[in-house]
From Swiss-Prot:
Belongs to the arsA ATPase family. The lineage of its organism: Eukaryota, Fungi, Dikarya, Ascomycota, Pezizomycotina. This is ATPase GET3. Its main location: cytoplasm. ATP binds at residues 34-41, 245, 272. Homodimer. Keywords: ATP-binding, Cytoplasm, Endoplasmic reticulum, Hydrolase, Metal-binding, Nucleotide-binding, Transport, Zinc. InterPro entries: Anion-transp_ATPase-like_dom, ATPase_ArsA/GET3, ATPase_ArsA/GET3_euk, P-loop_NTPase. It holds the Pfam family ArsA_ATPase. One of its GO terms (biological process) is tail-anchored membrane protein insertion into ER membrane. GO terms for cellular component: GET complex. The keyword Zinc applies. It is found in: Cytoplasm; Endoplasmic reticulum. The active site is at residue 63.
Length: 341
């Protein structure tokens, strides 16, 4: 974050993410943007800040390129585990190449998990893996599990690059519609299918079609609940991360338009890797790059005057490990003040 006070007018919004910390109803926070703009660093840092004001925080990576382990210098897997040095911040990395059946079963008792025990065995797994973008399916299954357990007060998602993220957020709507259609078809053809299945010895596990359909209806209700939560600005928000370059700005604009069309709240943008060369600097490349960045920063200000725009400086070291992440996270809530230009 940065020289916001210098660049913006007095009527602009705070150039920090403090509003997210103050929003006590917030349950889902998605952090996303183009690849290579600092999403993971930003999501880890935001989770650290949230852990200071909330009882329990879970950080989930839905990016197949999992970087949480690298960022914290600690190995994470598909089970949530505490981040070293914290007693209320946990992290996990969903493996899109793992078995979806394993993921759906991790909730323990199948009776508590509407997606587990549908009685479809390998067919359910085949169906899941036939969906374009299985990582979205895996991630969404984890969301469903968290909705049912409610064991964390707030969940932060370090998302995959833009396209995957938007498909993931669209997933509940698509799935809800598909299950509604399936339910409609089953009510029409259920009796006939039951008689056919009865003649063939029934379904695996001794379940009948009605039991499976009732579990699918329960699943549809849960998905509907998730959908409603994602579209509730009191519960869900999306933090856009970008750098001050044309392609990143273009991607951010497209993402915000799509989020708006999905009715998902977004009002914060983090602009990373900003240069602030001093006025006596002899680095001509730095000055030229700063000039270009200023141009795109001005565009961001014009386009998103009702957003909290956070300006983060380019650092001389990688942000890895708890101490550096904490230092970086402080700049998300206390604006970085650059040297005079």
């Amino acid at each position: 974050m940065s020289s916001t006070a210098m660049v913006s007018g007095d009527d602009s919004l705070e150039p920090t993410l403090q509003s997210l910390l103050d929003q006590k109803t917030l349950r889902w926070v998605f952090v996303g943007g183009k690849g290579g703009v600092g999403k993971t660093t930003t999501s880890c840092s935001l989770a650290i800040q949230l852990a200071k004001v909330r009882k329990s925080v879970l950080l989930i990576s839905t990016d197949p390129a999992h970087n949480l382990s690298d960022a914290f210098g600690q190995k994470f897997g598909k089970e949530a585990r505490l981040v070293d040095g914290f007693d209320n911040l946990s992290a996990m990395e969903i493996d899109p190449n793992g078995s979806i059946q394993d993921l759906l079963a991790t909730g323990g008792d199948q009776a508590d998990d509407p997606m587990a025990g549908l009685g479809l065995g390998g067919m359910m797994q085949d169906l899941a893996f036939s969906i374009p973008g299985v990582d979205e399916a895996m991630s969404f299954a984890e969301v469903l599990k968290q909705v049912k357990s409610l064991s964390y007060e707030v969940i932060v998602f370090d998302t995959a690059p833009t396209g995957h993220t938007l498909r993931f957020l669209q997933f509940p709507t698509v799935l809800e519609k598909a299950l509604a259609k399936l339910s409609q078809l089953s009510s029409q053809f259920g009796p006939m299918l039951n008689s056919i299945l009865g003649a063939r010895g029934g379904l695996p596990g001794g379940q009948n079609l009605d039991e499976i359909l009732s579990k699918m209806e329960s699943l549809r209700e849960t998905i509907g609940e998730v959908n409603a939560q994602f579209k509730d600005a009191d519960l869900t928000t999306f933090v856009c991360v970008c750098i001050a370059e044309f392609l990143s700005l273009y991607e951010t604009e497209r993402m915000i338009q799509e989020l708006t069309s999905y009715q998902i709240d977004t009002h914060c943008i983090v602009v990373n890797q900003l240069l602030f060369p001093g006025k006596d600097s002899s680095c001509e490349q730095c000055k030229a790059r700063r000039k270009m960045q200023k141009k795109y920063l001005n565009e961001i200000e014009d386009l998103y005057e009702d957003f909290n725009v956070v300006r983060m400086p380019m650092l001389v070291e990688e942000v890895r490990g708890k101490e550096k992440l904490e230092k970086f996270s402080n700049m998300l809530v206390n604006p970085y003040v650059p040297p005079e230009e």
